[in-house]
């Protein structure tokens, strides 16, 4: 057998072993998650939840890294950048998230075909061990609700030669 065959098998095995370690899962709201928006992004269906007046509440077990992926709906004719924002309540602490992105033309909505959506605004939070409550609240000076999805990724285990750095907040 040639070395090319062995090399391609080795690359495949390494790729799948890395993919299994970096598994991410979509989090579903535990409260007020009945309303959903299905967006088609690169021929894949992605589930987003609008942040309405009641907010969205999630219960998450740590340690994990939470990714907040948000988009803002815009009518089809608009092309400029659009600012949108929301608030995160994490175990009683408040974080205000502000984004400003251009409209991405390739995204379509099943429920709202006359809307386009901005590029995604991503925000990350690392959670320590334990159970955490995350509440997402709207900021009311916006015309449309912000659409959001939360993805949870587990941390890889620390080896003896790695050091965990903690940021200092003043």
What feature does the model see in each segment?
Residues 24-59, 74-77, 105-115, 151-170:
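Glycan-recognition and processing domains
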Residues 89-95:
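Short strand-turn-strand beta-turns centered on an Asx-Gly dipeptide
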Residues 113-127:
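Beta-sandwich interaction modules
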Residues 64-74:
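A short beta-strand element within beta-rich, extracytoplasmic domains
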Residues 78-86:
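Short coil-to-beta strand junction motifs in C2/discoidin
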Residues 66, 126-138:
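Noncatalytic modules at the cell exterior or secretory-pathway interfaces
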Residues 75-77, 139-146:
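Short acidic/polar inter-strand loop motif in beta-rich domains
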Residues 10-19:
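Bacterial N-terminal signal peptides
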